[in-house]
Amino acid sequence: MFMINILTLILPILLAVAFLTLVERKILGYMQFRKGPNIVGPHGLLQPFADAIKLFTKEPLRPATSSTTMFIIAPVLALALALTMWSPLPMPYPLINMNLGVLFMLAMSSLAVYSILWSGWASNSKYALIGALRAVAQTISYEVTLAIILLSVLLMNGSYTLSTLATTQEQLWLLFPSWPLAMMWFISTLAETNRAPFDLTEGESELVSGFNVEYAAGPFALFFLAEYANIIMMNMFTAILFLGTFHNPCNPELYTTNLIIKTLLLTMSFLWIRASYPRFRYDQLMHLLWKNFLPLTLALCMWHISLPIMTASIPPQT
């Protein structure tokens, strides 16, 4: 039964990823005054499936000098971790209801760094290695601010359990009292998922394609699936944290519909940003985090910690 539960979670995610690739190409197309994919199926709707068949039926080439085991394990690990991170998300009922769901998600996103590092190192190519090192430095750096912002939100939530966020936000979205945190969180999720304008890992002009330059066919498709599954997951996490949805136990499908609409809008903004902004320079990327975001998030975190202590002596304002 548990296997069926897992499959009912994984298959819709993979389907959503397939159509996200199509939506991205369509949006980029319309923003550049062209149509995008429109040949395969009605309005190009079957394009993702054609791409999948093409990629998975090609021969997976491997450089002769690469480290075989790591080279094969890295893409599988990337996708496995990307799909594992969905398990504690309440939609409205999570696959695994954890008390420390937030910590689990932080740990999983930290582990995702290893798949990138292994793929870059195992490829035995200087471009792949530089791309992987950039990705690791960027991901680890932005995880610092993500963790501090999460801590601030959880201080308002009063629990590490994600399902209680719906109760916390019954009256007011956390976006309003903590909008600076929400804005920094959104920009940090862009950097965490290696999306434009922070896609320095795959700077075509300098690194060919980044850490996955030596990958082809199936393994390359696995990296691609992992990246897009992470994008949707991060946006759903943002919607749960800052745009809390009211959960009525008698009508749980309303919660799901509401959450999916919010996630879709956030994902669209990811694609819109990709079409609108050029890539950052690497030193600007690091400057933004260590000199701007980190002091601000630390100050706001201290404020959220001291607020309940300062107001502890005030009688209840009802």
UniProtKB/Swiss-Prot annotation:
One Pfam family it belongs to: NADHdh
Q: Which domain of life is it from?
A: Eukaryota
Give UniProt keywords alphabetically: Electron transport, Membrane, Mitochondrion, Mitochondrion inner membrane, NAD, Respiratory chain, Translocase, Transmembrane, Transmembrane helix, Transport, Ubiquinone
Q: Which reaction(s) does its UniProt entry say it catalyses?
A: a ubiquinone + NADH + 5 H(+)(in) = a ubiquinol + NAD(+) + 4 H(+)(out)
Enzyme class, spelled out: translocase
Q: What topology does the record note for this protein and the membrane?
A: Multi-pass membrane protein
Q: Which GO terms describe its biological process?
A: mitochondrial electron transport, NADH to ubiquinone; mitochondrial respiratory chain complex I assembly
Tell me which GO cellular component terms the UniProt record holds: mitochondrial inner membrane
**Chief localization class?**
mitochondrion
Family classification: Belongs to the complex I subunit 1 family.
* Known partners and oligomeric status: Core subunit of respiratory chain NADH dehydrogenase (Complex I) which is composed of 45 different subunits.
Identification of the protein by name: NADH-ubiquinone oxidoreductase chain 1
Source organism (scientific name) = Balaenoptera musculus
